[in-house]
Structure formats: structure tokens, C-alpha cells
């Protein structure tokens, strides 16, 4: 009887041991498959270090959403988890999100600035974290260093492409004196300032004397805003030869306003920037004369790769297919590309 009891006890011990082993194996699998808010395996990719990277977005729009998707795809490919947070154009939220990433133990953060003058505060909030600014260049480029870099496009270049297209258009008509309506983005923002300066200075260099048909319209990069603001000019009889817009959305607002006023938008050149899907369609149809492709995918994937390069101690342009600035090694440029009726099919 004692032997039977002993045998039963030994069997129970053995079963408990086997159950414990099975429980440990199950727990390891669960840990390996755990998901972050980015929806990717936290253990994928190379080992060591915090595998989470936060992208702090100034706001959501069509173009920036494409940038986010490209950054997330690049993160996933390299075995990192990306979490995107939207500041809703609130400077204070940007600081809070950066601090949260730092407190979570993240080692690098990607920031699309709400305000270019905010860069110093972002770097301070990041503490020991490395920072990649994307798309919006800090107002003070002297803040950039081996731990704080920029990936984006040279905004002045977009204006240069607009001006060259307009100069060619008007010279073909034998015209060197023109009046323009200017649709500005967010006032004070680097993209607004540099795109505007680029187009106006290059028109002068090209021998085109361009004067304002009205005061610039500050439309905040918004289609509906542009439509509302330009409509009174169209119905008041204001004379103009072209519409220069800091982005496609505002240019498309002007197109809609002209159609609403029974005017043909293809009768004069309307130029934009970004080459959004709608912008490309407008160029193809003739409603817009041209746009300038701003590579959202290149900026998003380039920023993520630069962030990973900083973590690994590699040059920031490694594996990006891009080049650093000739004078500032902490800037990686993503080139703009002019888009006209001749090549728009390549962008659709």
C-alpha cells in the first residue's frame, strides 16, 4: 500500500514538472509575439537596445500621412516598432510627446516640427535621446549636430522650379511683365518663407518683372481657405497673369474658385508644390500648369533610416540613397522634382 502511495506521489510530481516546462515554453512564445502600438513584433530585427521609435507629427494631412506610412514601413523592415503621435498643431503637445518617449527609455525620436523656432526646446526635452527632424527644417540650423539631424527637402528649390516653369511660359508669349496672386502657407513657417523667396527671386533672375496683383493671401496650406480667400478677387475684376501657390491644396482651391466664377483655370498658369494625387490629376487635366514633387516616401523612409543610423553610430545617409549637404554634414536632402504635363504620368 505504501508503495502504491509512493508511486502515485511520484507520478504527480512528474506531471507537475512537465506542466511547468510547458508553461515556460508558452510564456516565451507569448513574449516573442508581443505587439506594440505600432503593431509589430518588439523582438524582431537586431538584438539589443530599445526597439521603439516615436514619430512626433505636427498634424495630419494627405502628404504627411504618406510620410508616416513610409517611415513605418522602413521601421518594420529594419525590425523596429514605430508609434506615431499627432500634435494637432499644438507646440506644447510636441514637447510632451518627446518627453514621454524619453521617459519610456527610447533612444531616438523623429520630429516633424509644429514651429521651426521650437527645435531648441525639442532637443532640450529629448535629453540624451537623439533627434531626427523631418520635413520642417529648424529655424536655427546651428542647433544641428551629431545627435540632432535633419532629413527633408530644400524648400527654396521648390520655388525655383515654379519660377523656371513660369518664366518659360511667359517668355514663349513674349511677356516679361506679369502680375501674380500669391497663395501663402502658414506665415512664418520655413517652407512658406523659402518657397516664396525661391520663386520670386528666381523670376527676377530669369528676367521676369513680377508684381503683386493683390496682397499675398495667407491660406495656411488649406484648400477651402484658399478657395474662400481668392473668390472675392475673381469676382472683383482683379487682373492677374498667374497664381503661385506654396502647395497643391491651395492651388486646387484656386482652381475650384475659378470654376465657380465661370473662369477657365487652364487659361493661365497655376503652379503648386507637393504633387499630391489631386495635384497630379489637375496637371494632367490642364487645370494646373505644373507642380513640384515633394517626395513624402523618401523623407519618411530617409528619416527612419537616419534614426537607425544614429543608433548604430553610422553616417546619417547610410542606406538612404541620399546625400548629405555639402556644407552641413547633419542635413540629408531629399530632392524636389518638377512635374508638368510632359512627365506627370510618371507620378500617377
Predicted features along the sequence, with ranges:
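Hydrophobic alpha-helical
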Residues: 111-131, 199, 215-281
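Bacterial lipoprotein signal-peptidase II cleavage site
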Residues: 19-46
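Extracytoplasmic "Venus flytrap"
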Residues: 51-74, 83-96, 106, 112-116, ...
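Hydrophobic alpha-helical segments within soluble ligand-binding/sensing domains
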Residues: 49, 94, 150-178, 226-227, ...
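Sec-dependent N-terminal signal peptides of Gram-positive bacterial secreted proteins and lipoproteins
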Residues: 2-24
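Short, solvent-exposed amphipathic alpha-helices that sit
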Residues: 63-80, 158-165, 190-209, 225, ...
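Hinge/cleft segment of the Venus flytrap/periplasmic-binding protein
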Residues: 51, 183-191, 202, 302-348
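Flexible loop/hinge segments that line or gate small-molecule binding clefts
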Residues: 121-157, 276-284, 288-289
Amino acid at each position: 500500500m505504501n508503495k502504491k502511495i509512493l508511486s502515485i506521489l511520484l507520478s504527480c510530481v512528474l506531471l507537475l514538472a512537465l506542466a511547468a516546462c510547458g508553461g515556460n515554453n508558452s510564456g516565451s512564445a507569448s513574449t516573442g509575439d508581443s505587439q506594440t502600438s505600432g503593431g509589430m513584433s518588439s523582438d524582431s530585427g537586431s538584438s539589443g537596445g530599445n526597439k521603439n521609435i516615436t514619430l512626433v507629427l505636427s498634424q495630419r494631412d494627405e502628404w504627411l500621412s504618406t510620410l508616416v506610412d513610409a517611415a513605418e514601413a522602413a521601421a518594420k523592415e529594419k525590425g523596429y516598432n514605430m508609434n506615431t503621435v499627432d500634435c494637432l498643431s499644438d507646440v506644447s503637445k510636441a514637447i510632451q510627446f518627446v518627453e514621454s518617449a524619453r521617459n519610456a527609455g527610447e533612444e531616438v525620436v523623429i520630429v516633424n516640427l509644429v514651429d521651426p523656432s521650437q527645435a531648441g526646446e525639442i532637443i532640450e526635452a529629448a535629453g540624451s535621446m537623439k533627434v531626427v527632424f523631418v520635413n520642417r527644417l529648424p529655424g536655427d540650423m546651428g542647433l544641428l549636430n551629431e545627435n540632432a539631424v535633419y532629413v527633408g527637402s530644400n524648400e527654396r528649390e521648390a520655388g525655383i522650379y515654379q519660377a523656371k516653369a513660369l518664366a518659360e511660359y511667359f517668355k514663349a508669349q513674349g511677356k516679361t511683365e506679369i502680375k501674380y496672386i500669391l497663395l501663402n502657407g502658414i506665415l512664418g513657417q520655413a517652407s512658406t518663407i523659402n518657397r516664396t523667396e525661391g520663386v520670386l527671386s528666381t523670376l527676377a533672375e530669369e528676367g521676369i518683372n513680377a508684381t503683386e496683383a493683390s496682397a499675398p493671401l495667407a491660406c495656411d496650406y488649406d484648400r477651402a481657405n484658399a478657395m474662400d480667400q481668392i473668390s472675392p478677387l475673381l469676382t472683383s475684376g482683379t487682373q492677374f497673369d498667374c497664381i503661385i501657390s506654396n502647395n497643391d491644396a491651395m492651388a486646387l482651391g484656386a482652381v475650384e474658385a475659378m470654376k465657380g466664377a465661370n473662369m477657365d483655370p487652364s487659361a493661365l498658369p497655376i503652379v503648386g508644390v507637393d504633387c499630391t494625387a489631386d495635384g497630379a490629376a489637375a496637371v494632367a487635366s490642364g487645370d494646373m500648369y505644373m507642380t513640384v514633387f515633394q517626395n513624402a516616401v523618401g523623407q519618411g523612409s530617409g528619416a527612419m533610416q537616419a534614426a537607425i543610423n544614429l543608433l548604430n553610430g553610422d553616417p546619417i545617409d547610410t542606406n538612404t540613397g541620399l546625400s548629405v549637404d555639402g556644407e552641413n554634414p547633419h542635413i540629408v536632402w531629399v530632392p524636389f522634382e518638377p512635374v508638368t504635363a510632359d512627365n506627370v504620368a510618371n507620378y500617377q
